[in-house]
């Protein structure tokens, strides 16, 4: 979701969408878009650039306002909206406090985390207090990319969503896996946005990394493939015959979820994604039903009601 007050906050902070496009969002427009594409329910989230623009107190206030709105939308339109809580990272005390409020008081469905915060990727020791609490709660965590500081220094003219986003998610996934955080915090259900970035395409490369280099944990290939199957993956901007076959080789089939990236990606892309899933080679009716609905019902049991 991208309510007016949130868009104004990141504009005032000098931020912009990585596509350069203007974004429109209201609950009514969301419902119209969902109805037009046969979408029964959306799990809303605040994605990049998050809510922390340099001031801890302001970030706490903005996170609270976003999360309370998300809860309000779920109450106003029951069965149509759920939500992932946004946290005021990298400020850890505020993030832990908001996590408790959002999950215990507001009853949100999980948490969205950027792949990196203040230059530190998920799996970094500095973020372990948060992962420990998420693990204790067996939380669902959507991992969404951002623009790592290093991406801004590359000198490439292309919008960040085209390449830097998928690399950012991939870096976080690799760090979670090879740092051991994915195993240490095994109760967390991590969803990787955008089909896991480039992870499906380089999964075999990752599996032979221990054979090539002493700098990575000396694990057998199957342990690495099993780690990659522990992630959940959404299909935002990768629901085509180009990408889905690779994703289906890497992910457990019951851990692939439909994602749209709307409103940052236009509604036309949502329609193309739905058609792409139908037409992708190897996607059976059963697998398509899982991606479009059944897998989400397993991840969010409350939706059964």
For every predicted segment, state its role:
Residues 166-170, 181, 187, 211-212, ...:
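Active-site-adjacent C-terminal substructures of enzyme catalytic domains
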Residues 1-41, 68-76, 97-101, 188, ...:
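Mid-to-C-terminal alpha-helical segments outside catalytic/metal-binding sites
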Residues 44-179:
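Active-site gating/metal-coordination segments in enzymes
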Residues 21-25, 51-52, 89-95, 118-125, ...:
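Acidic-and-aromatic substrate-binding clefts and catalytic sites of carbohydrate-active enzymes
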Residues 1-25, 148-169, 206-230:
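Active-site gating loops and adjacent loop-to-helix segments of metal-dependent hydrolytic enzymes
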Residues 7, 52, 151-158, 196-211, ...:
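Histidine/acidic-residue-rich catalytic or RNA/ligand-binding cores of hydrolases
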Residues 140-143, 147, 167-178, 182, ...:
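Conserved N-terminal glycine/acidic-rich loop preference
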């Amino acid at each position: 979701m991208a309510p007016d007050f949130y868009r104004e906050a990141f504009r005032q902070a000098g931020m912009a969408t990585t596509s350069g496009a203007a974004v429109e969002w209201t609950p009514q427009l969301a419902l119209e878009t969902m109805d037009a594409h046969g979408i029964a329910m959306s799990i809303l989230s605040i994605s990049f650039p998050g809510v922390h623009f340099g001031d801890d107190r302001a970030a706490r206030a903005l996170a609270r306002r976003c999360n309370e709105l998300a809860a309000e939308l779920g109450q106003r339109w029951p069965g149509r909206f759920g939500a992932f809580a946004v946290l005021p990272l990298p400020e850890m005390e505020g993030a832990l406090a908001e996590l408790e409020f959002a999950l215990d008081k507001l009853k949100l469905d999980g948490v969205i985390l950027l792949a990196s915060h203040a230059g530190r990727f998920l799996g970094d020791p500095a973020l372990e207090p948060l992962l420990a609490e998420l693990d204790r709660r067996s939380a669902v965590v959507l991992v969404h990319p951002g623009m790592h500081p290093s991406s801004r220094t590359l000198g490439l003219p292309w919008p960040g969503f085209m390449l830097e986003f998928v690399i950012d998610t991939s870096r976080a996934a690799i760090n979670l896996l090879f740092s051991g955080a994915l195993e240490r915090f095994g109760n967390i259900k991590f969803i990787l946005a955008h089909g896991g970035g480039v992870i499906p395409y380089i999964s075999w490369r990752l599996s032979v990394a221990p054979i090539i280099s002493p700098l990575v944990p000396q694990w057998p290939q199957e342990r690495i493939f099993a780690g990659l199957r522990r992630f959940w993956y959404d299909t935002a901007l990768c629901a085509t015959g180009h990408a889905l076959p690779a994703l289906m080789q890497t992910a457990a089939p019951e851990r692939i979820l439909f994602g749209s990236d709307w409103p940052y990606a236009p509604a036309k892309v949502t329609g193309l994604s739905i058609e792409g899933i139908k037409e992708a080679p190897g996607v059976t009716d059963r697998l398509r039903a899982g991606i479009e609905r059944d897998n989400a019902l397993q991840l969010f049991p409350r939706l059964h009601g």
